[in-house]
Amino acid sequence: MARKRTLGGKAPQAGNKVSHSQRKTRRQWMPNIQTKALWSITLGQSVKVTISTSALRSVDNAGGLDNYLLKILPSELTPSMRRVARQIRERKAAA
């Protein structure tokens, strides 16, 4: 699975693995990315996202996907999530 996320803002980190003898070997630490279907109450449907586990906790703390997308800056979202956030804003404004 590609380590690309639609929510979460995490990217692979690079660094050195250091052994007991202090030999340094380059390596990458990959974020814990999961594919989930999160329910949008406003849209009345599920939205499939690839999300880091820390962002999944943030979604839970915000009270759901709708509140999280309304709270986060649009510049931190991918184009597909910006589209979903715009749909949520339009539905909430119409209601």
Swiss-Prot record:
The keyword Metal-binding does not apply. Transmembrane segments: none annotated. The lineage of its organism: Bacteria, Pseudomonadati, Pseudomonadota, Alphaproteobacteria, Magnetococcales. PANTHER family: 39S RIBOSOMAL PROTEIN L28, MITOCHONDRIAL, LARGE RIBOSOMAL SUBUNIT PROTEIN BL28M. It comes from Magnetococcus marinus (strain ATCC BAA-1437 / JCM 17883 / MC-1). GO terms for molecular function: structural constituent of ribosome. It holds the Pfam family Ribosomal_L28. Keywords: Ribonucleoprotein, Ribosomal protein. GO terms for cellular component: ribonucleoprotein complex; ribosome. It comes from the Bacteria. Residues 1-28 are annotated as: Disordered. This is Large ribosomal subunit protein bL28. InterPro entries: Ribosomal_bL28 (IPR026569), Ribosomal_bL28/bL31-like_sf (IPR034704), Ribosomal_bL28_bact-type (IPR001383), Ribosomal_bL28_sf (IPR037147). Belongs to the bacterial ribosomal protein bL28 family. GO terms for biological process: translation.
